[in-house]
Each structure stands twice: as structure tokens, then as C-alpha cells.
């Protein structure tokens, strides 16, 4: 049997494209000759300007409904072929927000609502408003970026002696994202595939004490990298996974097996 070629959607929208994972994904998609629409709350991701070949940049705060409406209009005007969406935008544990981290009495309802708006509601509303486009274009696919904390409780011993935290709204939003994945997979079938990736901890300059404790719990002996997650997203976007939908691909080096 010869080597099979695989295809990606013609255009892929990446939210949260300014972060470490989002920017790495944009780079990988461009390398595969995919037209990328990148969006984030900041102007561009470092070190590349918005004019980078293969990437059309839209600055948008997905917490704001009017920004999501504008984003959808831009996607409609540019997506002439099959469409992929990677919902990656999210508040993360290191986000510097008042009422975000710390003990539960320090976590505000306002910030809880903001986190769910960006991580979950924005993913729902953007997909809803592009459903007609997705359904008419064979090869369209959606990938949600979830987390192992959608289904695992945090091990607080990992965080001792550090400024790192694991806010309640983060995991709750990601759990919602995974159920949205399953709901959309059955609702948009057979024309659109919908899957998710659930990364474990990615090594991003955390304190060495945290890294050592975390890696001691990982059967593969290390924290993840952006490349580990990007490769999984590429698989789920492409025709390599043509018979896969409604699934959550856990990319954690076996952390969740412990």
C-alpha cells in the first residue's frame, strides 16, 4: 500500500492565535499551505507581524459580542473553500486577572463569567454563526482546545511554594467545551467533524520545583510541548482523521493514568 496523502481545510480560523500554542499552530498550518485567519485580543503574535504571508490577522476581544459578530463577517468574506475552526482562546492559569486565582473566596463571579464567555460561549456562538458555511463545504472540521483539567481535579501539592494556580473556572469551562464537542459532533454530522484535544501541562518556564513534581507524575517523564499539541490538532483537522468525530484526544504523556 502506498503512502496516502491527506488534506486540510482550505481556510482555518485560529482563535487565541497570539499565545504560544496558537502561534505555533498558525506556523504549522502555513507550512502546510493552509490559509490562516488568526485572531486574538492583541495586534499580532511575536515575532511575526500581521502581514506574514499566509496569515490574515483580525484583532478581536472574543469576550465582546460585537467583536465576535465582526469576526464571523470577516471569515465569511474570506472563506471560499472548506473551513476549519480551532477554538483555542481561553483564560489560562497565568492570566493576570483580578478575582481569577487564589483560594475560592478570592475568585470573583465576574471573572468566572468572563472566563466562560471567552472559553465556552465564544466557541459556541462562532460555530453557530458559521454553521451554514461549514455544512456546505466538504472537508470542514472543528477542533476545540480543552485541558486535562476538564476531567481531573488539580493536585495542589504541585503548586506549593510557587505563584502558579489552577482557577475553578478554567477546568469548568473546559469541561463545557468537551460536552459542546460531543453535542456539535452529532448535530453537525455528517458534513462537519468536531473533535477536541486535551493537553496536559506544557513546559513554559515554570519554577523548577513545579516542573520536577509534575514530571514525576508523567509516565513519559516530561512535560508537553506546543509541538505535541499542534501535531494532534493537525491530525484532527486533516483527512487523516476522516472517520473520527466527537472525540477528545488526551495529550498528556500519560499523566491522567496515575
Predicted regions and their residues:
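Short C-terminal tail/terminal secondary-structure segment
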Residues: 2-6, 154, 234, 245-258
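Canonical Rossmann dinucleotide-binding motif of NAD(H)/NADP(H)-dependent dehydrogenases/reductases
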Residues: 2-37, 184
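Conserved NAD(P)H cofactor-binding loop of Rossmann-fold oxidoreductase domains
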Residues: 88-101, 253-254
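Catalytic loop of short-chain dehydrogenase/reductase
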Residues: 105-111, 135, 143-186, 201-202
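Alpha-helical segment proximal to the catalytic Tyr-Lys
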Residues: 132, 182-190, 242
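Short, small/polar-rich loop/turn modules that mediate ligand/substrate recognition or access, typified
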Residues: 139, 189-193, 244-246
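A conserved structural motif in NAD(P)-dependent oxidoreductases
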Residues: 218-229, 240
Amino acid at each position: 500500500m502506498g503512502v496516502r496523502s491527506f488534506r486540510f481545510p482550505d481556510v482555518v480560523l485560529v482563535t487565541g492565535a497570539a499565545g504560544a500554542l496558537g502561534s505555533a499552530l498558525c506556523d504549522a498550518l502555513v507550512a502546510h499551505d493552509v490559509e490562516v485567519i488568526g485572531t486574538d485580543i492583541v495586534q499580532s503574535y511575536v515575532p511575526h507581524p500581521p502581514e506574514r504571508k499566509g496569515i490574515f490577522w483580525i484583532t478581536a476581544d472574543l469576550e465582546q459580542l460585537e467583536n465576535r459578530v465582526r469576526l464571523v463577517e470577516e471569515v465569511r468574506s474570506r472563506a471560499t473553500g472548506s473551513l476549519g475552526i480551532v477554538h483555542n482562546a481561553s483564560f489560562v492559569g497565568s492570566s493576570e486577572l483580578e478575582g481569577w486565582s487564589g483560594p475560592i473566596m478570592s475568585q470573583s463571579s465576574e471573572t468566572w463569567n468572563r472566563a466562560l464567555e471567552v472559553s465556552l460561549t465564544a466557541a459556541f456562538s462562532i460555530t453557530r454563526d458559521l454553521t451554514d458555511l461549514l455544512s456546505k463545504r466538504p472537508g470542514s472540521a472543528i477542533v476545540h482546545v480543552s485541558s486535562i483539567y476538564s476531567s481531573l481535579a488539580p493536585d495542589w501539592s504541585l503548586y506549593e511554594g510557587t505563584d502558579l494556580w489552577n482557577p475553578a473556572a478554567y477546568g469548568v469551562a473546559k469541561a463545557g467545551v468537551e460536552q459542546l464537542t460531543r453535542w456539535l459532533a452529532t448535530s453537525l454530522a455528517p458534513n462537519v467533524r468536531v473533535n477536541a484535544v486535551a493537553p496536559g501541562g506544557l513546559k513554559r518556564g515554570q519554577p523548577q520545583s513545579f516542573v520536577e513534581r509534575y514530571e514525576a507524575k508523567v509516565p513519559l517523564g516530561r512535560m508537553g510541548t506546543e509541538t505535541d499539541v499542534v501535531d494532534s490538532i493537525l491530525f484532527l483537522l486533516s483527512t487523516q482523521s476522516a472517520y473520527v468525530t466527537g472525540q477528545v484526544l488526551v495529550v498528556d504523556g500519560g499523566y491522567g493514568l496515575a
